[in-house]
């Protein structure tokens, strides 16, 4: 298995899919990393040369991933808790977080589906 950012990525998968195994790198960023490194995303990781892997590692270092990203997310949540933001209050009350209206199915009863009844 190849190592990128101290994470072992699967050898038998395509490079663009393997990079998504790293926390903080999704499909879009994986494609961007491969494009910047001039590496074909359809190649399997085991087919990549050491030079290509080095270029991928260098490009991936530019992004916030794994522990740093998790730490940043936790700090953002703590900051919201300290200032007692509306979102945190809604989280604590276990209600809708983004001020959308709740589904009133409990009051209305189960959804009636008339599509399958004979006409």
UniProtKB/Swiss-Prot annotation:
Compositionally biased spans, kind Basic residues: 92-110
Gene Ontology CC entries for this record: cytosol; small ribosomal subunit
GO biological process: translation
Superkingdom of origin: Bacteria
Keywords in alphabetical order: Ribonucleoprotein, Ribosomal protein, RNA-binding, rRNA-binding, tRNA-binding
UniProt region (Disordered), positions on chain: 92-119
Parts of the chain that traverse the membrane: none
Pfam families tied to this protein: Ribosomal_S13 (PF00416)
UniProt keyword tRNA-binding present: yes
Record GO terms (molecular function): rRNA binding; structural constituent of ribosome; tRNA binding
Subunit annotation: Part of the 30S ribosomal subunit. Forms a loose heterodimer with protein S19. Forms two bridges to the 50S subunit in the 70S ribosome.
Family from the record: Belongs to the universal ribosomal protein uS13 family.
Function: Located at the top of the head of the 30S subunit, it contacts several helices of the 16S rRNA. In the 70S ribosome it contacts the 23S rRNA (bridge B1a) and protein L5 of the 50S subunit (bridge B1b), connecting the 2 subunits; these bridges are implicated in subunit movement. Contacts the tRNAs in the A and P-sites.
Descriptive protein name: Small ribosomal subunit protein uS13
Species annotation: Mycoplasma sp
Gene name per UniProt: rpsM
